[in-house]
Amino acid sequence: MYSAAGLMNGQQLLSFEKGVPLEQYIIVDYYLYIKALHLIFVITYFAGLFYIPRLMVYLVEAADRPQAESDIIIPQLQLMMRRLWQIITVPSAVLGLIFGLWMLWINPFLLGKSWMLIKLVFVGLLVLYHIKTYRFYKAFLQGNGQRSARFFRIWNEGATLILFAVIFLATLKDSIHWIFGLLGLFSLAFLLLLGIRLYKRYCN
């Protein structure tokens, strides 16, 4: 069990303390439920965000198939993309954001932590990534996808890099040095691009 005082100071207490009102423990219990819901919807959001660009790759490749095949495949892929975006990705993004803001409202102490401020910067980048992905999504539904399959394979890894950064920041907090963090992200980006290149070479 955690106390509210311990939560606000970034500490975890293993038992009830004298003089701490029961209401504060109840608040912390709610905080843990809110945190769990936040994590659940972040996971489902990224699941959608990972698969949307993959469907875009398939749509680009389907356009190069014979007309009889593309006329069947493309509408089905567009339907899958629309359902994934409207039923899973967007609702998960909204709920994940609501529960995340709720956590900060309960525990504003987090805003004084440097790791949280850096994490919020990556969340801002994620919002920009989401907006751009939405524009690609609308273009594909209108039959105007003008990028290559390789571009969307690379674009697909943008969410991966942001996810790695957010998870490491939330887990290691202030114990991670920003230089090592940047080196880790650049190394991951290099490995992802190398994997895409090797995959393309293998397919050819």
What spans do the regions from the language model cover?
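Polytopic transmembrane helical bundles with strong interfacial aromatic enrichment
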Residues: 9, 19-204
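Short, often N-terminal, low-complexity regions
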Residues: 4-13
